[in-house]
Amino acid sequence: MGVPLRVVSYNIHSQRDDTAALAAVVRSAKPDVVIVQEGPRRFRWRQKSATLAESFGLVVAAGGLPALGNLLLTSLRVQVLDTRCQRFPLTPGRHLRGAAYADCRVAGARFTVAGSHLSTDPAERPAQAVEFKRGLDAATSPVLAGADLNEGPDGPAWATVSQGLTDAAVAADRADRLTYSCHEPRRRIDALFVDPRITVVDYDVVDTPQTRRASDHFPVLVDLLLPGTD
């Protein structure tokens, strides 16, 4: 038997929308891990990250400004063993991007959780995907990676990041579920990829009146079984 883990990957639109709805969406999901894109990354980012985590009933594991707004949050069930942040090379005139990583343990199972948010510029994304993939490949535990890739499964950056990993939506036969935008869903640009040793039990893109108020992206909610290692 594996160890259950519930994960949410969520672009929260820099908390520009209904923050009460946002908190309610995450709390109702009862996740062990939340991978946030567009989290706090500027003035007082530590305090803002802690406040966001508290509103979700979670704690900050890694990320924030050092990861350019990628933020990893966990429940107290998850033990965080180590963390690191990554910054991708800057293209002049564009936004600086990066990734966050946390090595964790839950009920005797080790895993590495990672999050990133790639550029809206298709010329930048392939190189950023290579950097993110290097970070994922450096992990010594089974990886789960949540990202807003800003492109669909037919894109080159998506292909780079997903290589050797399982697309949770495909594994659950729900790749038809679109993640963006909440106003007019047309694209699946948000994904959760997992090590093949991790079992995808269930996958959902949560589309409700509340999630439509909370952000411009729908949250990706995935139930996993981790391989026990201890």
Model-flagged regions — what are they?
Residues 126-141:
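A long, amphipathic alpha-helix that forms part
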Residues 2, 33, 38-110, 204:
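Structured beta-strand-rich core segments of catalytic domains in phosphoester-bond hydrolases
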Residues 57-77, 91-95, 150-218:
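Active site of divalent-metal-dependent phosphoester/diester hydrolases
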Residues 1-54, 70, 225-230:
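N-terminal, active-site-proximal structural segment of metallo-dependent hydrolase catalytic domains
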Residues 12, 39, 116-118, 147-149, ...:
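Active-site metal-binding loops of divalent metal-dependent hydrolases
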Residues 32-33, 111, 142-144, 167, ...:
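Short, Asp-centered acidic motifs that coordinate Mg2+ and/or phosphate
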Residues 141-153:
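Acidic/histidine-rich, metal-coordinating catalytic segments
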